Amino acid sequence: MQVRRSHGIALHVPDASLPQLQGYLAQPGRPLKALLNRNKVERLADGRFLYASRPYQLLNFQLQPEVVFRSSWDGDQLTIVFEHCTIHGLGRLQHLVEFQCQAWIRPEQERLLAKADLSLEFSPNGAGALLPKPLLHRTGDLALGLVTDRLEKRCRSGLIKGALNWLARNP
């Protein structure tokens, strides 16, 4: 069973030109460190990064996602694709749930457009077989809601602040 969610936002970046915002996004480490806690982002080889989130509570679980993702700039948009995500804190259920995310940040005149497609997949031989589907769907939807809320908050604060700071240093 799979639960999906898409979420997008437009972020106003006053007085920023399209070439300036392209310059900001052209080196993926810049916006990623603005979006995520820069002390928890580790650059790996080939445009890949490792990130360990801070723990958060969902129902009776203290969850801490750890993600390996790839990020690249193609001249038009920054693409972020999760390659592997481990959700620590699920105990025996850990290997029964798979989280996937693909996100894009596209620059326009005076704004950044951010979009993410998220999914949680429950193993049909594990959690999908043990728990009622309505419960799995509600729990999955709640979890994805927490993730999108957190992503939007990071975009509205960290990404905008990072872009404005970079633009001030690189007019």
Feature names for model-found ranges:
Residues 91-141:
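Beta-strand/loop substructures that line and gate deep hydrophobic ligand-binding cavities in soluble
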Residues 131-171:
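A conserved amphipathic terminal alpha-helix motif
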Residues 11, 24, 79-86, 91-93, ...:
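Low-complexity, acidic/polar, glycine-enriched regions of mature
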Residues 1-58:
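Hydrophobic ligand-binding cavity/cleft-lining segments
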Residues 1-4, 60-67, 91-101:
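Amphipathic hydrophobic-ligand
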Residues 10-14, 54-56, 72-74, 106-108, ...:
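Solvent-exposed residues in well-ordered beta-strands and their adjoining turns
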Residues 43-89:
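Glycine-rich portal/gate segments that line the openings of hydrophobic small-molecule binding cavities
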Residues 39, 65-71, 100-107:
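Hydrophobic/aromatic beta-strand elements that line small-molecule binding cavities or substrate pockets
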